[in-house]
Amino acid sequence: MRSAQVYRWQIPMDAGVVLRDRRLKTRDGLYVCLCDGEREGWGEISPLPGFSQETWEEAQTALLTWVNDWLQGNEGLPEMPSVAFGASCALAELTGVLPEAADYRAAPLCTGDPDDLVLRLADMPGEKIAKVKVGLYEAVRDGMVVNLLLEAIPDLHLRLDANRAWTPLKAQQFAKYVNPDYRARIAFLEEPCKTRDDSRAFARETGIAIAWDESLREADFTFEAEEGVKAVVIKPTLTGSLDKVREQVAAAHALGLTVVISSSIESSLGLTQLARIAAWLTPGTLPGLDTLHLMQAQQVRPWPGSALPCLKRDELERLL
């Protein structure tokens, strides 16, 4: 016998979280819990403002429609990426397709003070990998910060993310301030320029490896082996169903590319599922999931080791 619940939630964010020039004061989303007999499966639907095509309200309408169809025996999935991902995760838990094993390691995210990152990395066992957002300040400053980190920690590898913020000139200004001897320790730089051609040229001219992120969600994107392209970053909330995520991972791995499963600032429930997906589909590659510290609470499923309070399901607003 099938049954389902849908919950709506809102989590206050720490001050200072800015996405594409807009301050994110709260993280808004939905959970779906599907039940079939004794089995249960959860999924998170949380479109990311400024990145997702759909709004929270549109996702809610699509989710409620899909859940009612599922209760009637329909096995299809919705089209909206965030809804398709959350619904497919709930189904994958329900049917046992999504393994329980998880990779709770996370590449620490440096959002401000480089000294803070140095302290966090000092306690990190094994390979030291961190992520730095670039493109928010002057390109010269970004280059100096990256150079400082690579100089201060000789075994550090950095993943950088520019979110297409730079013109070719700005990108070159950044590279100018990174010692050529350190550039090989930039694991990759996600989407440095506004166009793929400019990003490719940047990789050729600087020797800094790049990764595709936003490009994966563009209609004309195809997986190809390209000079200077080392990785792809997959954000499942923005991608779609779990099957689509698996297809993209397989296509990238077939070309020898590194695949990083990355957060779209999901709640703790969604992050724990991404940790399981990373362990399943990209074993051995550190996922990019260090975003929980941007929030003021966890929900339903806590992240191991987090001191944030965790709300239980009966504390959430139930829609169905």
From Swiss-Prot:
Its cofactor is a divalent metal cation. Belongs to the mandelate racemase/muconate lactonizing enzyme family. MenC type 1 subfamily. It holds the Pfam family MenC_N. Keywords: Lyase, Magnesium, Menaquinone biosynthesis, Metal-binding. Converts 2-succinyl-6-hydroxy-2,4-cyclohexadiene-1-carboxylate (SHCHC) to 2-succinylbenzoate (OSB). It catalyses: (1R,6R)-6-hydroxy-2-succinyl-cyclohexa-2,4-diene-1-carboxylate = 2-succinylbenzoate + H2O. The active site is at 133 (proton donor), 235 (proton acceptor). GO terms for molecular function: magnesium ion binding; O-succinylbenzoate synthase activity. Mg(2+) binds at residues 161, 190, 213. It is an enzyme of class 4 (lyase). The lineage of its organism: Bacteria, Pseudomonadati, Pseudomonadota, Gammaproteobacteria, Enterobacterales. One of its GO terms (biological process) is menaquinone biosynthetic process. This is o-succinylbenzoate synthase. PANTHER family: O-SUCCINYLBENZOATE SYNTHASE (PTHR48073:SF2), O-SUCCINYLBENZOATE SYNTHASE-RELATED (PTHR48073). Pathway: Quinol/quinone metabolism; 1,4-dihydroxy-2-naphthoate biosynthesis; 1,4-dihydroxy-2-naphthoate from chorismate: step 4/7; Quinol/quinone metabolism; menaquinone biosynthesis. Its EC number is 4.2.1.113.
